[in-house]
């Protein structure tokens, strides 16, 4: 029997994912009581309009997030988002914030997702979450591209050093078609590299980023 490991934060109305971006909100179109009248007491439904920034909760970046003429959410290949073999790299005890290529030495990464556990998600929904964050260096990202990784996730507030306006991690990874997933959580629950990762956004044409329900299936 399969077991599932949740890797996404729950989205709650008004929560903050990134400084300066609006929190999600739900606008009720009609509720159970109102719909009961429409269906003459035979059924009832709730329908709401959900308003959220693409960068809400745990989300993936398409290349269009960084580059004007690049593939958007609707162009992402499912084989690079679902049923992925993965390698988790634990970096809770790193020296300094920047995670360099040595963290991935000797790992077989071709065609796989790389999940970087920093422990930063322990600060989720606190002001400390937006302190200077753990990130991947430009050299680390080039290493991952050269090694053939197809998906890179991290449990930090950003895969880049937020003080570096060049955003080299986004530039290198998305520029080479590697999907990014930020604000992951519960990576400590992955005790081995067994199982398959799934993290699929909706196929929104013209969309650049969108929340995902990221999880691992253990057989």
Language-model regions, residue ranges each:
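Active-/binding-site microenvironments in catalytic and ligand-binding cores
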Residues: 1-219
């Amino acid at each position: 029997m399969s077991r599932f490991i949740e890797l996404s934060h729950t989205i709650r109305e008004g929560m903050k994912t990134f400084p300066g971006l609006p929190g999600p909100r739900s606008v009720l179109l009609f509720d159970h009581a109102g719909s009961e009248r429409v269906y003459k007491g035979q059924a009832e439904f709730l329908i709401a309009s959900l308003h959220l920034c693409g960068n809400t909760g745990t989300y993936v970046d398409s290349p269009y997030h960084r580059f004007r003429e690049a593939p958007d959410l609707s162009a992402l290949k499912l084989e690079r988002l679902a049923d992925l073999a993965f390698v988790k790299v634990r970096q809770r005890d790193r020296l300094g914030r920047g995670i360099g290529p040595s963290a991935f030495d000797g790992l077989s990464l071709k065609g796989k997702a790389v999940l970087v556990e920093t422990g930063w998600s322990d600060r989720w929904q606190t002001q400390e979450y937006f302190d200077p964050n753990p990130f991947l260096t430009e050299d680390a990202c080039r290493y991952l591209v050269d090694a053939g990784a197809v998906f890179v996730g991290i449990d930090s507030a950003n895969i880049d050093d937020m003080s570096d306006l060049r955003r080299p991690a986004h530039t290198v990874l998305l520029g080479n078609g590697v999907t990014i997933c930020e604000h992951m959580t519960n990576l400590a629950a992955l005790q081995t590299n067994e199982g398959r990762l799934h993290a699929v956004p909706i196929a929104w044409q013209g969309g650049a980023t969108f929340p995902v329900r990221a999880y691992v299936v253990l057989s």
